[in-house]
Amino acid sequence: ILAATNRADILDKALLRAGRFDRQIHVELPDLNERKEIFGVHLRPIKIDESVDAEFLARQTPGFSGADIANVCNEAALIAARNGKKFVQKEDFMNAVDRIVGGLEKRSKITTEEERKCIANHEAGHATLSWLLEHANPLVKVTIVPRGKALGAAWYLPEERQITTREQLQDEMCATLGGRAAEELVLGKISTGASNDLERVTKQAYAMVVYFGMSDKLPNLNYYDSTGQDWGFTKPYSEETAKLIDTEVQKIINEQYDRAKRILSENKEGHSKLAQVLLDREVIYSEDVEHIFGKRAWISRSQEILELQEKANGKNKENADKEAEADAKT
């Protein structure tokens, strides 16, 4: 008997005993190379432009399942057909990803000039820090056109890491706080637009202290509930420790916020140019950031993995050719 579930954690333990569903296979979401192969399959029946590259599309869709990738390809074909194109272009695939991830554009939603300036500086702050910090996720696209429930949207390229260091977490938090830091530095006031950013950094800082043991005052400790359930009325630490945790979380966030403001101040001219481009065109891409700040000084993990995979494929082909040659001689 075969069965599938995406919530194995809530199954009755009796179901998993020997002689029942005693053999389990965990199917993870496809990684970079697997997404590239899946795109290759779904692109075959579509008339695509020469600019479309399965590797590029795979890098733009981290966390997508096989069904999500099929949906992207179908949506891109529909967008191209609506615009009367003979071939599906790279732009159509990017618009398809945007629509699936962020929802429909809502150009009918009117924003004031002051709101547009605030959103542009906020998003340019994220983009600037993401480009300048080694471990932050680099920009793919930013728009100030309302999409879904949001007044603007940004897409970044997260690195699919197996492990994460303290420095990587700090860079991610610093880039996330770049939006609010830019508002304070440029406009002299802050807005509610950073609420989601603050939620993310608070969770990250809390995890660093409570789960990852990355706090200076509470090093190498992990406060967890061994039952696997959410904490109820009690927590596995004292009130004194709880206060110390709050202090450490606030300290980590303050350090990265000050760091974000410092980097933005040092790159004030570039950030200002980026915000102006965003106001003028309503959308910016990684090429625009590269034009202002230059190429990133670091190779991404995704690029490194692709290069390693190409080397492995080349070595496998070389070995296969040698075996075939040896068989031919015998």
Where are these regions (language model features)?
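Walker A/P-loop-proximal flanking segment of P-loop NTPase domains
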Residues: 24
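Short regulatory helix/loop adjacent to the ATP-binding pocket of P-loop NTPases
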Residues: 8-20
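Conserved C-terminal "switch" segment of AAA+ ATPases
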Residues: 13-14, 27-94, 99, 103-104, ...
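Short pre-active-site segment immediately N-terminal to the catalytic Zn-binding motif
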Residues: 107-118
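Structural recognition of the conserved hydrophobic beta-strand(s) that form the central parallel beta-sheet
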Residues: 1-5
